[in-house]
Amino acid sequence: MEIEQRRIMKREGEEEEDNNQLSLQEEEPDTEEEMSGRTIEPWTKQITVRGVFVSIVIGVVFSVIAQKLNLTTGIVPNLNSSAALLAFVFVQTWTKILKKSGFVAKPFTRQENTMIQTSAVACYGIAVGGGFASYLLGLNHKTYVLSGVNLEGNSPKSVKEPGLGWMTAYLFVVCFIGLFVLIPLRKVMIVDLKLTYPSGLATAVLINGFHTQGDAQAKKQVRGFMKYFSFSFLWGFFQWFFSGIEDCGFAQFPTFGLKAWKQTFFFDFSMTFVGAGMICSHLVNLSLLLGAILSYGLMWPLLDKLKGSWFPDNLDEHNMKSIYGYKVFLSVALILGDGLYTFVKILFVTIANVNARLKNKPNDLDDVGHKKQRKDLKEDENFLRDKIPMWFAVSGYLTFAAVSTVVVPLIFPQLKWYYVIVAYIFAPSLAFCNAYGAGLTDINMAYNYGKIGLFVIAAVTGRENGVVAGLAGCGLIKSVVSVSCILMQDFKTAHYTMTSPKAMFASQMIGTVVGCIVTPLSFFLFYKAFDIGNPNGEFKAPYALIYRNMAILGVQGFSALPLHCLQMCYGFFGFAVLVNVVRDLTPAKIGRFMPLPTAMAVPFLVGAYFAIDMCVGTLIVFVWEKMNRKKAEFMVPAVASGLICGEGLWTLPAAVLALAGVKPPICMKFLAS
């Protein structure tokens, strides 16, 4: 997934966000009284058989959904709240069925809910960040051809076709090591520094709410989820009958006319993206639409008129020296400008905050902590009760680092063992910086650390092996930094729901194991059934091409760019930095309207249609909030989850039918009269 999911959905005005972080901690007085009066079960009883089963089911379903979203657009919304909601729905339904059948069912606690959510998110998180639509897919032959077979730096030897065996092995050796990096610092970051981790805290508040709000509201959420899940699934089934061959069906409906359709401006009736638009913030969705208008509405039609002047008119439309090169590298410039600025900003915030703490300067979070000291002490006591030994963390990290140093070069001979060792020497400090920054700002910078590693490794390895080494090394660094950050966010959730850290760590391990097995299988379900990486098809996988061309830039430098593309890249890079500066330095009423450059970059390659889908979702939420804000607040996650899961689940039978050679019977197409 490529867009940093936690990041693009949380940056709608940092002043508002800071207030929200503090208000989250001041909510639910009844919840805390109830929790303080209840005996917390030992960590071994917080992990249940039914909890593991439900987490696997949710994790598998979400892995398929995330894989589809990744391979189509690269935009995957944060599904943590959906996972918590589904866990509550499944287990509550299970419990009620057992009770009506005369069986005794164990009460469903917030700790078990937290465990299920953690495990499911760990599972689908590998589908989001495992590189199946970016750095790993960027190694295949199709992406090599799209990048330009005659392009300097794009060596014919830099190809590795996807394989179930090597992909599964790669995931197992790079994903687990991140779980051990920051375990020794959990007390420092959660208890001593009191970092907020807004995503983890928000999930905890949601889970606490499920278990205290009463049956009436929970029933409404369940009914809303089931209603829209059924509608979305049946709609996907209905659409399938009319999608006989390429460019057929409702997904190609020329909503705004055939001229607009040729420039990808149409509504494709995707309930998945409508649901994703309901979860993503208005700023994200409008940034996507702005990027679509800027690219397919203005730039690409203008550049197309320069065919024969700026680039030869006899080139294939997907040749990197034609207009396609501008699409790829301008989107790369936006992403790098946004990422570099955010990286420097978070680094500065982290250093400034550490310096302030060393000087014992009070801050707002400390004041909140003093006001709720009794509650905090109860949470801290529970959080510190089940200690994870230091020797366990150190031995786990060293063991997986040693295994990875041996296995990764066997999978990718171009990535030498000493590069792996150097990466793991720096990984703990990078992981700490990233996790600390995420605790303050809720921005997970793992992808940016990965991109830096990609450029460095690609540059030092050389032309023949640089692309493969850079892409593989990118995954190595990104996985360690990302997994450790997500675990720390989950520790924050555990702290607030009074769940044992040992139970959380075990849940992460379970989810990671399942994810390492399920994610490659779900990827190959799509890879075998659909035309993955086709720029004109549904599954464009834009980030595979973006990452490969980043590696080529690292190897070759700017000679890989088409005519005048470098100057345009400077402009877009500067625009990305400028937008961020304006957002941070101007008042919130101005800064909150600044677009997100990374979100703007996605339609450059994918097209405008999915941005329109997302904006339909944001329009639904906007109108709903105007009509009944209170109802919208607790129903939007349920309805959006239903829309995403319904059509997402239909993908499974659709893929099976495609593998079996069963084609839709009707082709619905629209032609000019």
Curated annotation (Swiss-Prot):
GO cellular component: plasma membrane
InterPro entries in alphabetical order: OPT, YSL-like
Bias kind Basic and acidic residues: ranges: 1-13
Protein name as annotated: Metal-nicotianamine transporter YSL1
Topological type in the membrane: Multi-pass membrane protein
Ranges of compositional bias, category Acidic residues: 14-34
Record has Oxidoreductase as a keyword: no
Domain of life of the source: Eukaryota
Inducing or repressing factors: Slight induction by manganese, copper or zinc deficiency. Inhibited upon iron deficiency and induced by iron overload.
Gene name for this UniProt entry: YSL1
PANTHER family: METAL-NICOTIANAMINE TRANSPORTER YSL1 (PTHR31645:SF11), OLIGOPEPTIDE TRANSPORTER YGL114W-RELATED (PTHR31645)
Function, in words: Involved in iron loading of the seeds. Acts probably as a transporter of iron- and metal-nicotianamine chelates.
Residues passing through the membrane, by range: 46-66, 71-91, 119-139, 163-183, 225-245, 260-280, 283-303, 328-348, 392-412, 420-440, 442-462, 467-487, 510-530, 558-578, 604-624, 642-662
Entry-linked NCBIfam families: OPT_sfam
Segments of this protein annotated with the region Disordered: 1-39
Similarity-based family: Belongs to the YSL (TC 2.A.67.2) family.
